[in-house]
């Protein structure tokens, strides 16, 4: 794991200054580490270092990742190729429908990033896939299988970072690549492609291209407000640009062939990601206003952007205990904007606050008073990883947690219990089996899943990964898992036999390996388990493992 002492030490000072869940930003730390770009630059360097090392280890070799077809999740595992651990994935309530490598999707250098979907007027489902050298296009069929249709090259330097959103039947693409600008492309061009002859689109195929108020042609992200017909390029470079200052850079896109610059909200500097929409909610002062919920590295910043002509109207700006890199978030209900969830991309790596144990933390915010947001609670994932992009659909949040894959949580309890105590993890697919055997079930690095798209009416969910390629999956259920019933039967007694010195520790060691393997039969059970766990010994041993106390880590 790559750590940077320079920023981790400074972040420790910030965490130490915390006096409550929500808190005012630390102006000194903000100036030194965030406004300067130090933290963001070091995160990017950290990622590139990890990805370079993964490439050297062969993790980008397309030969490792053959095409995979439909495979059901059985007893917590998707065994897409029987006996092949590299193509066997932990799961719950999710079946695999299809997998294609990045090479099969037109980019042999891989490096998957963002993705976004579009549904045509006649119900066909398409995905635009961010890759190192451009954007690939697939159609998802009624059987969940992807058909590769072609690609739109970047027509700039390659980039690890490519962000995609839709406006009507257009996609808006931004990138960290120098001189990339913002590409706007008409997805209607996909409708009549013969899959036997995938198309490589040219610059002439673009609906438009712009780099207005982007001095280097770079934007870390793009945000679309479809209702009001605009997009914002955010996180532009260089920092300190006197016009936009890496903030919200607005464009009218009602005529996609001619995007018009509207101005910038530069007042809080760098914006990493945002969700902008017309406000409907309990704070009647802002009903009908154009509001952006922005994730600005060390703060949740809420803007009124109704006036976009180079003015900044900040409604509130707040930080929180353990803030390390405020990355992204999403509203629970866009029609009644009372709560949002927020992820921090660095707290697991820096060991800050609630994430000190390495299990991803998502923060719950009560925004019923836009001028005084409150951080009311949180919830955690069950596998060690770093949390990334998340989107809420009908009470379920679909979260890309890098090496832990896509995790799905039921958030419907939050309005009645905003502490997060009622939130449960209802489904997952862990698409990075390389780290399954590690303590906590995962690695705290920027590897694995980058993005997902779960808005299709068919129920198919698209997942884009950094090294491997693209998955289509579908939920088979969304119920909260039952609490293990730990009856003191002969099986559990055999695992915990206090009369036998070291038996509990022996069982804990066995279970750590046993639960990390999909290949279970009675022959791998210890002799005491085979004797004590009569009947379905494998199932009973699994239940006993779930009921053991957590092993204490060695000092």
Predicted segments, located by residue:
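Fungal secretory targeting signals
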Residues: 1-22, 555
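Helix N-cap and loop-to-helix transition residues
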Residues: 2-3, 186, 455, 537
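Intrinsic-disorder/low-complexity peptide segments enriched for small residues
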Residues: 6-13, 31, 204, 424, ...
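Short acidic, glycine/proline-enriched loop segments that cap or flank alpha-helices
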Residues: 14-17, 397, 536
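Fungal extracellular Ser/Thr-rich, low-complexity intrinsically disordered regions
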Residues: 19-75, 481-555
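Feature marking well-ordered beta-strand scaffolds used for ligand recognition
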Residues: 19-483
């Amino acid at each position: 794991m790559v750590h940077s002492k320079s920023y981790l030490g400074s972040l420790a000072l910030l965490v130490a200054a915390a006096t409550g869940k929500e808190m005012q930003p630390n102006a000194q730390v903000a100036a030194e580490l965030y406004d300067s770009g130090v933290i963001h630059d070091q995160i990017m360097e950290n990622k590139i270092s990890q990805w370079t090392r993964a490439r050297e280890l062969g993790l980008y070799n397309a030969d490792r990742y053959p095409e995979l077809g439909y495979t059901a999740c059985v007893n917590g595992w998707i065994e897409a190729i029987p006996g092949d651990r590299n193509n066997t994935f932990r799961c719950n309530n999710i079946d695999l429908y299809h997998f294609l490598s990045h090479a099969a999707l037109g980019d042999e250098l891989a490096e998957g990033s963002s993705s976004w979907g579009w549904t045509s007027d006649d119900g066909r489902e398409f995905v635009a896939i961010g890759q190192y050298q451009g954007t690939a296009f697939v159609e998802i069929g009624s059987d969940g299988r992807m058909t590769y249709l072609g690609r739109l090259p970047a027509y700039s330097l390659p980039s690890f970072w490519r962000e995609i959103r839709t406006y009507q039947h257009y996609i808006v693409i931004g990138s960290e690549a120098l001189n990339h600008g913002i590409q706007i492309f008409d997805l209607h061009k996909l409708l009549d492609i013969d899959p036997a002859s995938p198309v490589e689109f040219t610059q002439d195929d673009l609906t438009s291209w712009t780099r207005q108020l982007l001095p280097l042609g770079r934007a870390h992200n793009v945000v679309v407000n479809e209702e009001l017909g605009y997009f914002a390029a955010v996180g532009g470079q260089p920092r300190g640009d006197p016009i936009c200052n890496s903030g919200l850079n607005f464009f009218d896109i009602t005529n996609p062939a001619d995007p018009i610059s509207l101005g910038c909200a530069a007042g809080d500097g760098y914006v990493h990601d945002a969700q902008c929409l017309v406000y409907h909610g309990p704070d009647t002062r802002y009903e009908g206003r154009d509001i952006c919920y922005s994730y600005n590295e060390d703060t949740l910043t809420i803007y009124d952007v109704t006036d976009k002509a180079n003015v900044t109207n900040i409604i509130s700006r707040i930080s929180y205990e353990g803030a390390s890199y405020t990355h992204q978030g999403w509203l629970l209900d866009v029609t009644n904007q009372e709560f949002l969830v927020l992820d921090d991309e660095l707290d697991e790596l820096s060991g800050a606050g609630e994430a000190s144990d390495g299990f991803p933390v998502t923060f719950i915010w009560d925004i019923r008073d836009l001028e005084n947001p409150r951080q009311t609670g949180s919830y955690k994932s069950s596998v060690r990883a770093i949390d990334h992009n998340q989107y809420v659909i009908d009470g379920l949040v679909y979260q890309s947690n890098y090496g832990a894959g896509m995790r799905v949580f039921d958030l419907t309890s939050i309005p009645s219990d905003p502490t997060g105590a009622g939130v449960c993890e209802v489904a997952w697919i862990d698409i990075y089996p390389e780290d399954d055997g590690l303590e906590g079930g995962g690695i705290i690095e920027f590897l694995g899943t980058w993005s997902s798209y779960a808005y299709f009416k068919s129920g198919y969910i698209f997942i884009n990964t950094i090294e491997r390629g693209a998955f289509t999956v579908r939920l088979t259920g969304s119920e909260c898992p039952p609490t293990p019933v730990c009856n003191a039967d002969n099986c559990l007694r055999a695992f915990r036999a206090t009369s036998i010195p070291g038996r509990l520790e022996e069982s804990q060691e066995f279970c750590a390996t046993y639960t990390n393997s999909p290949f279970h039969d009675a022959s791998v059970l210890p002799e005491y388990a085979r004797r004590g766990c009569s009947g379905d010994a494998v199932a009973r041993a699994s239940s006993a493992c779930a009921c053991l106390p957590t092993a204490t880590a060695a000092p």
